[in-house]
Amino acid sequence: MKLSTVLLSAGLASTTLAQFSNSTSASSTDVTSSSSISTSSGSVTITSSEAPESDNGTSTAAPTETSTEAPTTAIPTNGTSTEAPTTAIPTNGTSTEAPTDTTTEAPTTALPTNGTSTEAPTDTTTEAPTTGLPTNGTTSAFPPTTSLPPSNTTTTPPYNPSTDYTTDYTVVTEYTTYCPEPTTFTTNGKTYTVTEPTTLTITDCPCTIEKPTTTSTTEYTVVTEYTTYCPEPTTFTTNGKTYTVTEPTTLTITDCPCTIEKSEAPESSVPVTESKGTTTKETGVTTKQTTANPSLTVSTVVPVSSSASSHSVVINSNGANVVVPGALGLAGVAMLFL
C-alpha cells in the first residue's frame, strides 16, 4: 500500500512539472524553445536562455520538449536511506526503449544413436590380403613358360641375282609391228602371230603385253662398185677411214676387206637397189652384219657421161655444174644415205 502511494505521488509530480514547463514556455516571449528539463535523482532543473536583442521578442518557434522520461522524485524516507523508485511513464502499450536485439541460438538436440557412435567414421584403407601361390617345391610362384613356334611360318629363300628376274608389264592401246618378219606376242593367255601388215582387234581387254628387251644390231653390205655424182661431194667411211669425192675419178681402196656401214629407217618400206642387184626390205630395228670377200674389195667411182646417164648437165654462169637428177640418180643417192 505504501509503495502504490509513492508511485502515484511521483506520477502527479511529473505531470505538474510538465504543465509548468509548458505554461512557462507559452507565456514568456523572452524564453526560446531551447529550454530543457534535466532530471536527476531527487532534483529538477529548468534552464532558460534569453532571446537575442535582434529577435525583438518575435520568436515563433515552438518550444521543444526534449525529455520523454518521467523525472524521479525523492520521497521522504522518515530517516531511512531508501532511494526513490524509478517510475516509468505509461506508453499506451508501446515501449520507448529500444529493444535489445538478442540472438537466440537454436538448441542442440542430440539424435539417438541406437548404440552407434556419432563421430564421423575414419576413412581407413584396407589392403587386400596377399595370398601366396603354391610353388610346388620351386622358387618361382608361376610355372616356367615353354616357347612355342608360331602357327604360320613362311620361309623366304635368299636372293640369287643369277636366277631371279622381274617381268615388266605395260598396258597398251596400240601395238605396231613391221613385216615381213613375223611378230609374236601373248596377251590374256592367247598368243598372236602377225606375218603381214594388218589391223588386229583384241576384244578381251584390258590386255597386257609382255615386251622383251631388244638389242639393236647393225647391218653391213659388201659392194664391189660404188657410184657417185658430182658436183656435190660424196663422203663415206670404210675400215676406219673417211673418203670424200668431189669430182669424177677412180678411187682404189687397197686395205681390204672393206665394209660400208648402212643404216635403215624402220618407217620406210621402199626397196633399196644396189649395183649388184641385191634387194632388201627393212626389218625394223634388227640388222645383220656380213664380212666382205677380200677378192671383191675394189670400189670404183665411174665418171658421169652425158650419153650413159639420164642426167642433164646445165652450165652455170658461176662456174658450177647444176645436176638435174633422174630416176637412176635418185636411186643412187638413196643408196648413199642407206
Swiss-Prot record:
Q: Per the UniProt entry, what are the Gene Ontology biological process annotations, in alphabetical order? A: fungal-type cell wall organization; mitochondrial genome maintenance
Q: Where is this region: 7 X approximate tandem repeats?
A: 58-137
Give the record's membrane topology. Lipid-anchor; GPI-anchor
Q: Write out the entry's keywords from A to Z.
A: Cell wall, Glycoprotein, GPI-anchor, Lipoprotein, Membrane, Repeat, Secreted, Signal
Lipidation positions, renumbered (GPI-anchor amidated asparagine): N318
Q: What extra comment accompanies this record?
A: Present with 1630 molecules/cell in log phase SD medium.
Q: Which family does it belong to?
A: Belongs to the SED1 family.
- Write down what this protein is called: Cell wall protein SED1
Signal peptide positions (record): 1-18
Kindly give the InterPro entries that the UniProt entry links to this protein: Sed1/Spi1
